[in-house]
Amino acid sequence: MSRIIIKNIPRYYDKEKLSTYLKSLPQLDAEITDVSVAKTKEGVSRRFAFIGFKNEEDADKAIRYLNKSYVETSRIEVHRALDYRSANEKLRPYSKYASKNIELKLQKKEKEEELRNLEEEKAKKKKDANLKRKFLDTLDPKAREFLKLSSSISNSRSWENEEVFDTEITNPVIPADEDDDEYQDLPAAKRHEGDSIKSTEHDSTLDSGVVIDGREKSSSELHEEESEQAAEGDTAKNSGTDAQAPLSDDEWLRLHRTRIKEKQPEEEVSVVGDELKSFDKENNDEHLERVTNDKIADASMLQKAENNVSEQERNIQLISETKRLFLRNLTYSCAEDDLKSLFGPFGQLEQVHMPIDKKTNNPKGFAYIDFHDADDAVRAYLELDAKPFQGRLLHVLPAKARSSILLDDYALSKLPLKKQRELKRKNTAASSTFSWNSLYMNADAVVTSLASRLGVKKTDILDPTSSDSAVKQALTETHVIQETKNFFEEHGVDLDAFKNAARSDNVLLVKNFPYGTSAEELTSLFSPFGELGRILIPPAGTIAIIEFLNAPDCRQAFSKLAYTRIKSSILYLEKAPRDVFTTSFKQSGKPELAQKVNAVEATTSEKVGTEDIESLDTATIYVKNLNFSTKQEEFQKVFKPLEGYLSAVIRAKPDPKRPGKYLSMGFGFVEFKDKASAVAAMHAMNGFVLDGHKLEIKLSHQGVDAAAEVRKQDSSKPKGTKILIKNLPFEATKKDVQSLLGAYGQLRSVRVPKKFDRSARGFAFAEFVTAREAANAMRALKNTHLLGRHLVLQYASNATMDDMQHAIEKMAKEANAEAAAPSITGKRLIETD
């Protein structure tokens, strides 16, 4: 866990102030990747913070140093932060600021939504009632009476309508001059009868649900009518008049009022006859609509429950389809190798793409991971989402599939066969694992280069009428390759790295371009894809090494320029071996060009062979007793001010516990321009204290030690004067082998085993007079091609040659015996006789 939590910090400490405080601590020398101070919704500090570090060692160091220390007057507590998922599963809310359970939040949200729907429904009903009232106010009495008489029989009982109609029409009035005592009980009975009639009218109206515009009268309207009639009855009783008085126009209107539909134009009110036809249908459909709405609501709830798939399941489904992950919240110092080491254990990776900001040349904080298998991508998502990585919580999401511009099979079939092969080869170039010989060169460019520097024609070097043209071509290539090796070594290229299978993401080997191609032309060809570092072109001008500052730019250039035409040739691109440069590139704003065109010179190996390696002066000092925590930048910073300083490096070894990481070995080397500067630096810096360690410095004998190591390794091998040449072309003759190897020493014997048809078997043996001559031939011809085949040379022991000879003799005897024996049919005939 590279993330820690600091509790009880001062309340007024924010992110900037806490970062400044941590960076000001000299003992806390570590890269801080994230600082997060917890706050409430109101912006008040909760007095704890999360701090992220680049690795776990720095986090442990910070815990040991900061725990139970004081930040101003507050004593802080520091320990490892819990994992995001573990914190949500194990911890319960302990303060009013803590988040509540997700289920409670969902329940609360559903209740609020139900209340909001009820309020909206009430408001709508109220609005409909107001619209109905306004509609009735616009009708004249005859229209209202017509609507009353034209109401559907199914919505009201006919006898009730008659009773109401009779009651409304015949309203007997008691004479005022009659004696009240004679009719003492009659008016009361009539009043009760009238009241009962009115009550029956109201009940029938309520039961029948008279519909004028497709809606029933609401209970509130009926209650309002009853209240008005009761008030009128009381008034009549108090005034001494009979309660069965005729209804006024307003009273009759209120009894028959209705509501219009929402958004119904007022000009359509007069067209009453057409609307009456749809009253019954609308009234009957209202109940059906309510039932249907209930069923739809139940179905929607069921559908909602079925579609209630969690976000994680949706992400897993998308990842299974695309096999691609999107990462965010990465540190700006994160590299693609860090992501490869993190996601590599889950399965085979197709691509790791981290976009780079062109202005700052730093990552943008997000990346894409392509897996070969969808199950591996899903497993990586489940394991690493919300997990700390370099001090930050890694956020993993499904990514969209990469856009492909490949043509389908039908479109490809319409193209010529040559064009089809070119497109397929170009599209598979980036993912292809095939590679040529690392120092492969165009044969025509090799001969043209040598002829140009010698000032002769190519026909003078390769005579078409000569039988040894292939040997001359091989010797020319050998010379150019040896010259190229020396040039690369002078410019900080580690030739031993070409033996490694791991490939670099930002360095390309550019091959097969014509002779005469300049560094400026290659720069203009590759620079549009990104910022370039070093560009190395050897004197022969047949191969180049181009370094990009950013890996994404290098990948883009590789995919766009592979197998493209350059002048009269096809450009071959190959990823260079990892760590091909011994020193890192110092960015200076423009690419560093290294191009050298010289006359033909003797190779360095030939010069060194005639000199004693121990007589060479050294300009390198050996520094030991370094602190294991001392970084490369600090080590270089100490020696950089010295006169004649060139470079400084701390030796490191791979960390077995952390793939992709390195551990300091406690010593290093500093290189100067000359021996005098190295001696002066040794006397000046010997005993200097760096990170608490006293440095011990002396002159380095690295060159002598390297030569001794080479001699030791060579002595452990079965050395001798005999060489075995493998992968020999079948067209090669004994004379070709003699001409090729004779250029490096005096040959004692050459033997090319042949088949029964007198053709070569694909290998040969050569014996030199001295072991030095054999070693020179081995070293020079290691990357040579003869008739298009890469020669493989190794020392041949006597046992190897004896075994080969014994195998050849055995095969010859078997062949002779088979030729002398009779046929199988003949044997069977003799035996039967």
Swiss-Prot record:
Domain RRM: 2-83, 323-401, 506-578, 619-702, 721-798
Cell location: Nucleus
Keyword annotations of the record: Nucleus, Repeat, Ribonucleoprotein, RNA-binding, rRNA processing
SMART domains noted in UniProt: RRM (SM00360)
Biological-process GO terms, alphabetical: rRNA processing; small-subunit processome assembly
Any coiled-coil regions, as ranges: none
Family matches, as Pfam families: RRM_1
GO molecular function list: RNA binding
Its biological purpose: Involved in pre-rRNA processing.
Protein family membership: Belongs to the RRM MRD1 family.
The protein's name in its UniProt record: Multiple RNA-binding domain-containing protein 1
Organism: Schizosaccharomyces pombe (strain 972 / ATCC 24843) (Fission yeast)
Lineage of the species this protein comes from: Eukaryota, Fungi, Dikarya, Ascomycota, Taphrinomycotina
Gene name of the encoded protein: mrd1
